[in-house]
Amino acid sequence: MASHDLITPNGGTLVNRMVKGADADALRAEAASLPTITLSDKQACDLEMIAIGAFSPLTGFVGPEDFRSICTSMRTADGTPWPIPITLAVEDEVKATLEVGGRAAMVHSDGTLMGVIDIESLYEHDTALELPSVFRTEDEAHPGVQAVLEEGHWLVGGPIHVLTVTPEHEPGEQFTEHRLAPADTRAAFAERGWKTVAAFQTRNPIHRAHEYLCKCSQEICDGLLIHPLVGETKPGDIPADVRMQCYETIIEHYFVADRTMLTVMPAAMRYAGPREAVLHALVRQNYGVTHFIVGRDHAGVGDYYGTYDAQNIFDEFEDGEIGVTPLKFEHAAWSNKAQGMVSSKTFPKIQGDQIFLSGTKVRELLDEGQRPPAEFSRPEVADVLIEWATAEAAATA
């Protein structure tokens, strides 16, 4: 089986904006004399996602036409499905050094030169359009809204040319062994003979409800891609290295190895709920995935979105417009009566019988120094979590 037999990337072509060899040497030399844009952690995540093709069909940060079209219609100006504008925001003093038709060097906050952008547009950041469209709220308490409001007032649009995506400022967060680009996962799926692949997105350790959804999807697909997000998340989320240890542990003990893959997605969380669910699905399509698990309040935060808004939003697209198939799962819970995971579709509701699980509840238990019970987490995963929580508590005592 060849990788070209897999699902077509969003927009039809898998983008690659990495520059190698002599071209890279020339770009580094040129960058030394260019104005500089220092990237935030979120922007560095976006740069990587564009460069490796995960954000295909984007070849760079969006210009004003795409920005407006994405905000109003969840499609780029040419009609390709895309729900969230990927922007490069700068402050006034940086904007003053830039000009349309020129170029700028993009550097990480640690000083690493990451690439160069061709400046095709400089335009005002219309947060009055973006916030209610993308986040369905302008509440500054929403972490995604807050992140946008803290960005610069000007947006730089244009294609990018990327030299590196993994500066060495946080080597423990890079997970090189599991950091596969879309071209790599597609090759791996083809080598394994997987024609249908389900992906599970997570920013939390996998608890029993997650495991249930994953295994339901494995019954209908050739393989499962556990694809945790390891880019920028909000304060309070369990660190990526701890989560990765949890994923490796549960796969080792409770999943079939030759039907399961673990790779990381280096994207930043936006907490945009329904629109981010569509983004996550399209990104997984670029990775070669055919089915995407969408559970309760996917990519949500607080009470900003309805329980199944992230599932219903897919109905706003025409049949076939989005290549990947959303797997819309009901809220799963542990049933004492059934002694296993159930949903409203699989088991009758009995008063006081079901224990509903969430990553937030697991974190609350850990903060209180309590071990997550077997109904919440597999014991091997609970061991990892309680060891981390104990060490963290000791460090802050």
Residue ranges and their predicted role:
Residues 1-397:
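Active-site cores that bind ATP or allylic diphosphates and position pyrophosphate for catalysis
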